[in-house]
């Protein structure tokens, strides 16, 4: 009778225990489930701290759901991920709700992972992501969770009743392990993990070596482990050091210092010339390279001074003053491109100097003036700038030519000794100067000297006044004087049988002043060729009309030759100068190939014959022989000129003008 009485009591107690366990599990489940009202807003939940659901600030800010909670085994009461309500968990009071509470006892009695006897700080803060794979103890804080302690104490009162829930819990725990193996790939078998007795937990630290071998911890170890050696190994470490600019990398470079490395990486000596950061490219072009080097005074890098290493000073002089011919062959396109590229700050600063003092360096007058000047002069030839602000280039060039013959000084002294002033009538001076100005306009159309006229035009008056103060004449004044001296030499040789052979050499200062006044208008706009021919005809006819009172012209048929017989005694006649014109024409045909030939006054020919291959042209017969003029060669020139007169008179005046026009068109085309 005792036995039947005991069975109903046991069943009743079991029911009561199951009810209490189910109610406790339900409370624990609610406590771990997030409040949907709190997730929406902390003010939405009216219960506040008394709410039976979880209010977690971390979960409210974190939109991700807890992976372990969805699988039914989240053991972290302060999990930072969301624990949404699970469907059927509230109604199902069977095994699934008990999973979230009872695995603590199961892991405590049957540890599957070697755990250290240290509580997990991340678990207590709700941020441990390892779950049951953590090597530290996941024990809740008893002060924070007072509701779980009576639930855990009640099953311990009855050992018979406590065994069954524990067995049920262990059986139910196997199901989540199977689910984890399906979802998480690469999980090792829990039974294969080393088992450590409860008495040997304190020795587990030495056995495991602080790094557990379970799978949940492997991704973190593999990320950290190979990462640290990668900074010290060869290839990858150097890439990282170069990427992040390590200071140790500067000590390599094949054992060289930082200064050596910087010097080797410099693209050139002219990178920071004049602190011009925008113009710091490596100049391989000849014009920019030469300009930069001359501004800095480095003549050895300049292409015009390529022979300086040989020590040939004569070659240095020829290269310096013959470089314009070499630059001339390079074409206008390259010159235009280089000039556009040089439109920089220094180009704008020296723009006025370039316009005013751009004179061909092959000109003898410029060379003479340059030697007399105390400071350097800036010039521009073909779009290439040269400047020597400290006159170091000029001084070095003058010192390099101490052993060479003083050709410039000899020619200047010879010219100064022989130049004399002669008188001319106002009518003659006007016509001849107009012809010279017209010839200057025609020559200005040539490409090699196209900009010379415009650049010298604004400098005439300034040079004239400045040179008078310095004590020597301007280049244009010396050129006019040399032209007059050249004209007077053949004429005197032709008229040496007459009582006054030096009559044509005199020139008054008054008319020279008038010619200087007219020279201001000599570089006006170019005139058409028809206008030039008209002026030449008017000058030829006007000269004979103005001097009709003093001249008588007679024709002599012998040899079909026109001879001009002058009867003037005090004034200079104009018609005999036609013979001088023929002299210059014949000489230019013989010695200057391809040059324009004009049948006009000798003053016109002065612009045609004063330069020959970059050197100043002197007529035949003008040679220095003990300070006296050699007239023998000059007489031969006169004879050649008379033959030219004969040929010119036979052709006729109309045919001569047509020939001139044809030749001019061919030269311009």
UniProtKB/Swiss-Prot annotation:
Membrane-spanning parts? none
A GO BP term here is:
positive regulation of DNA-templated transcription
From the record, what ranges are coiled-coil?
A: none
* SMART domains for the chain: ZnF_C3H1 (SM00356)
Keywords recorded for this protein, A-Z? DNA-binding, Metal-binding, Repeat, Zinc, Zinc-finger
Location of region: Disordered: 1-23, 150-175, 285-306, 376-589, 642-669
- Zn-finger region bounds: C3H1-type: 34-58, 60-86, 114-141
Does the keyword section mention Zinc?
yes
Pfam families, per the entry: zf-CCCH_2 (PF14608), zf-CCCH_3 (PF15663)
Bias (Low complexity): 1-11
Q: Which InterPro entries match?
A: Znf-CCCH_3 (IPR041686), Znf_CCCH (IPR000571), Znf_CCCH_sf (IPR036855)
Alphabetically, the GO molecular function entries are:
DNA binding; mRNA binding; zinc ion binding
Which cysteine pairs are joined by S-S bonds? Answer: none
Q: Which residue windows does the record flag with biased composition (Acidic residues)? A: 580-589, 642-659
Q: Where is the composition biased (Basic and acidic residues)?
A: 164-175, 285-299, 392-406, 420-464, 478-499, 547-579, 660-669
Cellular component, GO annotation: nucleus
This chain's protein is named Zinc finger CCCH domain-containing protein 17
Q: Which organism is it from?
A: Arabidopsis thaliana (Mouse-ear cress)
């Amino acid at each position: 009778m005792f036995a039947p009485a005991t069975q109903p009591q046991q069943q009743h107690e079991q029911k009561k225990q199951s009810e209490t366990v189910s109610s406790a599990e339900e409370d624990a489940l609610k406590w771990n489930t997030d409040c949907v009202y709190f997730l929406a807003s902390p003010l939405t939940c009216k219960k506040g701290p008394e709410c039976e659901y979880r209010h977690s600030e971390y979960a409210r800010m974190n939109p991700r759901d807890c992976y372990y909670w969805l699988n039914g085994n989240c053991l972290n009461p302060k999990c930072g991920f969301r624990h949404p309500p699970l469907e059927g968990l509230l109604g199902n009071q069977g095994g699934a709700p008990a999973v979230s509470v009872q695995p603590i006892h199961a892991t405590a009695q049957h540890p599957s992972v070697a755990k250290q006897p240290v509580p997990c700080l991340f678990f207590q803060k709700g941020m441990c992501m390892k779950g049951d794979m953590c090597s530290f103890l996941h024990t809740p804080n008893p002060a924070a969770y007072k509701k779980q302690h009576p639930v855990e104490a009640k099953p311990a009162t009855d050992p018979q009743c406590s065994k069954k829930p524990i067995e049920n819990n262990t059986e139910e725990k196997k199901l989540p392990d199977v689910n984890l193996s399906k979802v998480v790939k690469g999980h090792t078998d829990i039974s294969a993990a080393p088992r450590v007795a409860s008495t040997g937990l304190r020795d587990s630290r030495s056995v495991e070596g602080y790094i557990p071998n379970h799978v949940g911890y492997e991704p973190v170890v593999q990320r950290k482990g190979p990462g640290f050696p990668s900074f010290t190994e060869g290839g990858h470490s150097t890439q990282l050091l170069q990427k992040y600019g390590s200071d140790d990398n500067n000590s390599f470079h094949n054992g060289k210092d930082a200064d050596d490395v910087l010097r080797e990486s410099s693209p050139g000596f002219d990178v920071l010339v004049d602190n011009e950061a925008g113009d710091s490219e490596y100049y391989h072009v000849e014009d920019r390279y030469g300009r930069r080097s001359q501004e800095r005074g480095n003549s050895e890098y300049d292409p015009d001074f390529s022979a300086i290493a040989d020590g040939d000073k004569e070659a240095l002089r020829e290269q310096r003053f013959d470089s314009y011919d070499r630059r001339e062959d390079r074409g206008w396109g390259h010159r235009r491109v280089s000039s556009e590229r040089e439109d920089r700050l220094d180009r704008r600063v020296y723009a006025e100097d370039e316009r005013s003092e751009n004179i061909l360096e092959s000109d003898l007058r410029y060379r003479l003036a340059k030697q007399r000047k105390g400071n350097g002069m800036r010039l521009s030839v073909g779009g290439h700038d040269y400047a020597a602000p400290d006159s170091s280039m000029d001084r070095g060039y003058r010192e390099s030519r101490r052993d060479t013959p003083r050709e410039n000084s000899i020619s200047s002294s010879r010219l100064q000794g022989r130049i004399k002033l002669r008188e001319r009538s106002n009518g003659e001076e006007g016509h001849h100067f107009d012809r010279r100005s017209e010839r200057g306009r025609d020559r200005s159309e040539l490409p090699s000297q196209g900009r010379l006229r415009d650049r010298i035009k604004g400098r005439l008056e300034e040079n004239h006044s400045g040179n008078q103060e310095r004590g020597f004449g301007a280049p244009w004044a010396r050129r006019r004087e040399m032209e007059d001296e050249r004209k007077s030499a053949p004429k005197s040789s032709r008229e040496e049988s007459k009582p006054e052979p030096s009559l044509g050499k005199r020139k008054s200062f008054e008319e020279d002043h008038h010619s200087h006044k007219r020279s201001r208008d000599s570089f006006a706009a170019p005139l058409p060729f028809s206008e030039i021919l008209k002026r030449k005809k008017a000058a030829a006819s006007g000269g004979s009309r103005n001097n009709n009172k003093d001249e008588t012209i007679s024709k002599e048929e012998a040899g079909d030759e026109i001879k001009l017989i002058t009867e003037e005694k005090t004034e200079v006649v104009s018609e005999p100068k036609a013979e001088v014109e023929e002299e210059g024409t014949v000489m230019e045909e013989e010695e200057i190939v391809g040059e324009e030939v004009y049948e006009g006054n000798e003053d016109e020919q002065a612009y045609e014959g004063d330069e020959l291959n970059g050197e100043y042209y002197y007529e035949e017969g003008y040679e220095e022989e003990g300070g006296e003029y050699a007239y023998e060669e000059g007489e031969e020139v006169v004879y050649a000129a008379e033959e030219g007169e004969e040929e010119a008179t036979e052709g006729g005046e109309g045919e001569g003008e047509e020939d001139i026009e044809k030749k001019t068109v061919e030269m311009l085309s």
